Swiss-Prot record:
Belongs to the 'phage' integrase family. The lineage of its organism: Viruses, Monodnaviria, Loebvirae, Hofneiviricota, Faserviricetes. One of its GO terms (biological process) is DNA integration. This is Putative integrase. Keywords: DNA integration, DNA recombination, DNA-binding, Endonuclease, Hydrolase, Metal-binding, Nuclease, Viral genome integration, Virus entry into host cell. It comes from Pseudomonas phage Pf1 (Bacteriophage Pf1). CDD domains: INT_Rci_Hp1_C. InterPro entries: CB, DNA_brk_join_enz, Integrase-like_cat_sf, Integrase_catalytic, Tyrosine_recombinase_XerCD.
Length: 333
């Protein structure tokens, strides 16, 4: 135990892991016993959690990013979200944060945002603890591991009709940014996310296909396109081996607003929904759609299954009502 008196107060001064470890100095204790108790509590908490006594939730988030988050494609974005979340939670001491603290935060948060947003926050923070546990940097259980997420109604996906698609493309063609039109065409032809189509390089378009790389889930995919679209891409796209298109998201937003479509919360992503919806309504296969969209799980793609003409069609032919009518018709023949 290393404590010393500095004037009228006491200071705890010790090393975390011997002389080679981090030096801990905490000043301002009124009594010697309080300084000694701090050192005892420090090592007790470290033994229980694997983290220093004074580590706060934001410190865990930083450790998570350094050890794992930096390897994720959206790592910096998730870091920013988790840091903001820790701040809204009051940045508690890590060893004091528990499921009850989260439940109280959730109650307050629901007055500001939708339940799905709170569920997203819970998944992000729970993933931080789970990964630190796997890495051996957190010894306690995940405080959110047993917390159930809020049940929400499935959101009906909005998509554009064929007439609306034609109207939107006319507005894109009239845009002052001449890359807006081909990028919109790519999204509608291949189901691409806007940023995937917008960031295409010249080498990614060849052989009648668009080859998407470095995408959201790191799974590359190739989707065929019409010859006319391939020629247009090379004609309008920027020269050289780099990007074909300049940034045109803002130009698309203006074109979309000129159309006056009422699709709250939808902008560029509605092109992806529109492709998938019309693909299924045209009799497309759900597994093929999964590969086209690049979904890692079929669960995400199943949102479009109900649009298939054959979806649950057997409910009519196999229903007892249908069978009774069918039987009655046989009797009267």
């Amino acid at each position: 135990m290393t404590v010393r008196k500095d004037g009228k107060t006491w200071t705890a001064d010790f090393y975390e892991n011997g002389r080679s470890g981090r030096r801990i100095r905490k000043k301002g204790f009124a009594t010697k016993s309080a300084a000694i108790r701090y050192e005892q509590d420090f090592f007790a908490v470290k033994g229980e959690t694997g983290r220093p006594l004074d580590d706060r939730l934001s410190d865990l988030v930083k450790v998570w990013y350094d050890l794992h988050g930096c390897t994720l494609k959206d790592g910096k974005q998730r870091l920013a979200r988790c840091e903001a979340l820790a701040k809204r939670l009051g940045n508690p001491l890590a060893f004091e944060f528990d499921s009850l603290a989260w439940a109280r935060y959730r109650q307050r948060r629901l007055t500001e945002v939708k339940p799905e947003t709170v569920n997203h926050e819970q998944r992000y923070l729970s993933a931080v603890f789970s990964e630190l546990i796997r890495l051996g940097s957190w010894h306690k259980e995940n405080p959110l591991g047993k917390v159930r997420q809020i049940k929400t109604d499935q959101v009906e996906l909005t998509f554009l009709s064929l007439d609306q698609v034609a109207r939107l493309l006319e507005e894109c063609k009239a845009s002052t940014n001449n890359h807006t039109y081909p990028v919109a065409l790519l999204c509608l032809a291949t189901g691409a996310r806007w940023e995937e189509a917008e960031s295409l390089t010249r080498g990614a378009v060849h052989g009648g296909k668009v080859h998407y790389h470095r995408i959201k889930n790191r799974q590359s995919r190739s989707v065929p396109i019409p010859d006319e679209l391939e020629r247009l891409i090379f004609k309008v796209g920027m020269p050289g081996s780099g990007r074909l298109f300049m940034s045109c998201r803002a130009a698309f937003r203006c074109a979309y607003q000129r159309c006056g479509f009422q699709t709250p919360g939808q902008m560029t992503h509605i092109l992806r929904h529109t492709f998938a919806s019309h693909y299924m309504m045209g009799g497309g296969d759900i597994l093929t759609l999964q590969r086209i969209l690049g979904h890692s799980s079929i669960t995400m793609t199943m949102r479009y299954a109900h649009l298939s003409p054959e979806h649950l069609a057997s409910a009519m032919s196999l229903s007892p009502l249908y069978q009774i009518k069918h039987f009655a018709s046989q009797v009267h023949q």
